[in-house]
Amino acid sequence: KIWFETRFSKPFAEVETDTVGGHVVTFSFDTHAGEKLVVVTAISGTDARGAHSNIVAEAPHDSFERYLADAKSAWNKALKKIEISTGDIDEKTVFYTALYHSLLAPVVFSDVDGRYRGPDGVVHQCAEGHKHYSTFSTWDTYRAAHPLYTILEPAAAADMAQSLIDFGIQNGRLPVWNMWASETDMMIGYHSVPIIVDAILKKLPGIDAEA
């Protein structure tokens, strides 16, 4: 399940629903030529309350330009953690594109208040200051991506390891390939184990190794 809350930069003039051809809602607005309508949406895998909390905390305004600038700043900060010495623009493009791809997942699944819905269908609460992650393609990422996270983002890497442990407790076994509070069981092997072990052996803080 996914919950969402949407805000428009101006009130809609009319709304129509269609439950015959599918669950479709059509909004109509009184706009003039060249006017821009900004649509802001927050999502939650927990509940409607989570979606509301997320939009209030993470999307408080309707300026697309500000969101764009914030996104660029965040990505520049992340990508600048590794600098390569080369004058070859093609080499830089390949390297930073690969680094960008490595940071697209896992993703934060908990809401801004730290709540998240587990594979058991129950809403759980992260420890204060921590986040719960999802979308673990462990078969693809245990060799290089996760060891890289322990260097570039140790706090996030610790939360990822704890997220795998928590998922295992809530689901009865460690995840193979989990996505949004569910187990897809894609790929072979059991690669949550080396991810967790690597984080524990590197003594990343915040991991319950006895769970």
Model regions and ranges:
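Secondary-structure capping and boundary motifs in well-ordered enzyme cores
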Residues: 90-91, 131-140, 185-192
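Acidic/polar, glycine-enriched structural segments that form the non-catalytic walls/loops
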Residues: 1-132, 174-176, 205-210
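Helix-terminus loop motifs that line ligand-binding clefts
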Residues: 116-120, 124-126, 156-211
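Alpha-helical support elements that line or immediately flank enzyme active sites
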Residues: 97-110, 134-158, 194-203
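A conserved hydrophobic secondary-structure block that centers on an alpha-helix together
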Residues: 21, 85-88, 131-135, 145-146, ...
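Extracytoplasmic/secreted proteins, especially bacterial periplasmic and envelope-associated proteins
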Residues: 70, 74, 90-97, 143, ...
